[in-house]
Amino acid sequence: MTGLERQLTEMLEAPVGALGYELVGLEFIRAGEHSTLRVFIDHENGIFVEDCAEASRQISAVMDVEDPITVAYNLEVSSPGLERPLFKAAHYQQFVGHEVSLVLKMPMNNRRKWKGDILDINGEIVTVTVDGNNEEFALSNISKANLVPKF
């Protein structure tokens, strides 16, 4: 998570929470004129289009006042979806036993991409069973983590 993403998360958790939603996480993708702020929300009863619209209005209002992003961007608000992104240690704990796809910031054993089942989370270290071996990953070295849907 970048410094900006951390700042945005801290800024938006309370307003999104006040609407009754969990701020699962967010991503800011810089792409010149086409930058995107992608915000993932969840609720115990699921997320519907109306929920995303309500959260989008609230987030837009906060962003207009605070103005933390200096470039033009598009705001996207959605549920985490089937390939749910994992941002926090609590997310890994919630999905112990599920398959996860990881992309690392710095390679480990000459690999940046890993896929396996979440075995455990201990502090800031997640253990994933990959091809029968237990591999430990520091959360600070994970640039992207998503659940792998089972069909």
From Swiss-Prot:
The keyword Cytoplasm applies. It is found in: Cytoplasm. Keywords: Cytoplasm, Ribosome biogenesis. The keyword Signal does not apply. One of its GO terms (biological process) is translation. SUPFAM superfamilies: YhbC-like, C-terminal domain, YhbC-like, N-terminal domain. It comes from the Bacteria. It holds the Pfam family DUF150_C. GO terms for cellular component: cytosol. Its main location: cytoplasm. InterPro entries: Ribosome_maturation_RimP, RimP_C, RimP_C_sf, RimP_N, RimP_N_sf. Required for maturation of 30S ribosomal subunits. PANTHER family: RIBOSOME MATURATION FACTOR RIMP (PTHR33867:SF1). NCBIfam families: PRK00092.1-1. Belongs to the RimP family. This is Ribosome maturation factor RimP. The lineage of its organism: Bacteria, Pseudomonadati, Pseudomonadota, Gammaproteobacteria, Vibrionales.
